[in-house]
A protein has these predicted regions:
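Membrane-helix interface/capping residues of multi-pass secondary transporters
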Residues: 36, 45-48, 85, 114, ...
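Helix-terminus/linker motif at the lipid-water interface of multi-pass membrane proteins
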Residues: 30-48, 118-125, 181-188, 250-277, ...
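Transmembrane helical elements of multi-pass membrane transporters/channels
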Residues: 16-35, 137, 171, 200-204, ...
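Residue-level hotspots within pore-lining transmembrane alpha-helices
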Residues: 23, 27, 31, 61-65, ...
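N-terminal transmembrane alpha-helices
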Residues: 6-43, 56-71, 75, 100-107, ...
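Small-residue-rich hydrophobic transmembrane alpha-helices
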Residues: 48-108, 145-163, 271-335, 367-389
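Short alpha-helical transmembrane segments in multi-pass integral membrane proteins
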Residues: 1-18, 76-141, 185-240, 297-363, ...
Length: 442
């Protein structure tokens, strides 16, 4: 049975509606993880470090799609809640068009930024050259990567989360098969890994574009539109928190890599890469749930259904709490097997990775609440509050921690800084939720 945004959502229905978005985010994370697995095990730790070194810049450029998807999705859902279907389709078409054009411009810009950014982070020799090779191939598919991120959010708004899941699974499976072929069978190293990812991103961006360009049974389709500056600015404002979050995380990742090069060398960067890969899967569950439930929040906000808003918030926080405990336990129990999956060929690097993960796992107890809190305010069209939560969580607290903690605990301080930043961010999120309660009636 197809679930409508106007339905009443109990725990079962809420999870059913959000599940496709959760799986979508997991499969999106698999792109990077599969690359990392094959590159590390078949091309060696220098190639693995090269991918990890340049990845933050690529994520900064790609997260424009997440900004348009979450920000536009919130505005579209609110517009549908106000019973303005034609206007919703015009906004939908506007943001798809603008984001695709942004992708082309950013791809050209990124092409020239790759080398100076890699050199700034301390890369040289083979590490530098492999970073640039990987980055330039990925940039060819950047417009499709942006569209893929965007459609992952908008499929839920169109009340077609399962269709979004099928597209993401198809592109994810394509990535895995191509990685096995181009890195495992044909030893093309970072070139093969980048080509596999670029092709899968093309699939993930083009298939939804074709679907929405034709007549379909969803609530959204591409139509003729007038350039609406106000709607575009509102979209960017709503999605600024998600954009800022991804940009900040990428900037912080660069700083982590610089600190790790200082305290542990290339092995430290490789260990951090393993943490980030595993974290992508765990965080994808929180992000997927937040993205999947955001259209429901936005619709009920537009319909002024405060009773449903209260129920959605309380149920969501309970679900996140249960997931957080399970993720922490899984992180502690499977630190060693997960480490062996990526760096089992190097005992010293494996030992460092397992130790780091046993500390890092504590962050899972707190991160989901801040991720959901930011998304919740985006869905309420309160982009400023959402951006503040993201800015504090992903930039201010992380920067402060990663600069100060190593002065006290050296290498362990770098791993502890992630946990410390999440504790500070959940405190800020709770304060914002309490402070805005009367204004939004939740």
């Amino acid at each position: 049975m197809n679930i409508k945004l106007s339905d009443y959502f109990d725990y079962k229905r809420l999870l059913r509606f959000a599940l496709p978005s959760i799986i979508m985010m997991i499969f999106t994370s698999i792109y990077c993880i599969v690359d990392g697995f094959f590159v590390s095990n078949y091309a060696g730790k220098t190639a693995f470090a090269a991918v990890n070194l340049i990845m933050p810049l690529l994520l900064v450029l790609g997260c424009v799609g997440f900004m348009f998807g979450t920000g536009g999705g919130a505005l579209i859902a609110k517009t549908m809640g106000e019973r303005k279907a034609d206007k919703a389709n015009e906004i939908f078409t506007l943001i798809i068009t603008v984001s695709a054009l942004c992708g082309v411009v950013l791809a050209v810009l990124g092409f020239f930024l790759l080398r100076p950014v890699a050199e700034f982070m301390g890369a040289d020799g083979e590490l530098l050259e492999q970073s640039i090779i990987y980055g330039r191939i990925i940039l060819i598919a950047l417009p499709f990567y942006i569209l893929q991120f965007e459609f992952q959010c908008l499929f839920a708004t169109a009340e077609k989360p399962k269709l979004g899941l099928y597209v993401t699974v198809a592109s994810g499976v394509a990535n895995m098969i191509l990685d096995a072929l181009l890195v495992g069978v044909i030893p093309l190293g970072v070139t093969g890994a980048a080509a596999a990812t670029a092709i899968s991103e093309f699939i993930g961006g083009v298939v939804p574009l074709v679907y929405f360009a034709r007549k379909n049974d969803s609530r959204l389709r591409l139509v003729k539109f007038k350039f609406d500056v106000k709607a575009l600015l509102k979209t960017c404002t709503n999605g600024s928190s998600e954009f800022m979050s991804n940009v900040s995380m990428s900037i912080v990742s660069m700083l982590y890599n610089m600190q790790l090069m200082k305290y542990a060398g290339a092995d430290g960067v490789a260990a951090y890469g393993v943490l980030m890969y595993v974290s992508m899967i765990f965080q994808a569950i929180f992000i997927g749930f937040a993205v999947g439930t955001a259209p429901i929040v936005g619709f009920n906000f537009g319909a002024q259904n405060t009773a449903e808003l209260k129920g959605l918030l309380s149920k969501s926080l309970r679900i996140i709490g249960v997931c957080a405990v399970f993720m922490f336990a899984a992180g502690e129990l499977f630190a060693s097997p997960l480490g062996k999956l990526f760096v089992g060929y190097d005992d010293e690097l494996l030992e460092m990775t397992v130790h780091a993960f046993s500390i890092f796992s504590f962050s899972f107890l707190f991160s989901g609440f801040s991720i959901y809190g930011s998304s919740f305010f985006t869905a309420l069209n309160d982009g400023l509050t959402s951006a503040m939560i993201s800015f504090l969580r992903t930039l201010v607290f992380q920067l402060a921690a990663v600069l100060l903690f190593p002065l006290i605990w050296e290498l362990d301080g770098i791993w502890l800084s992630i946990v410390g930043a999440e504790v500070m961010s959940i405190t800020a999120t709770v304060l914002f939720l309490i402070g805005k309660r009367k204004r939004y009636g939740y």
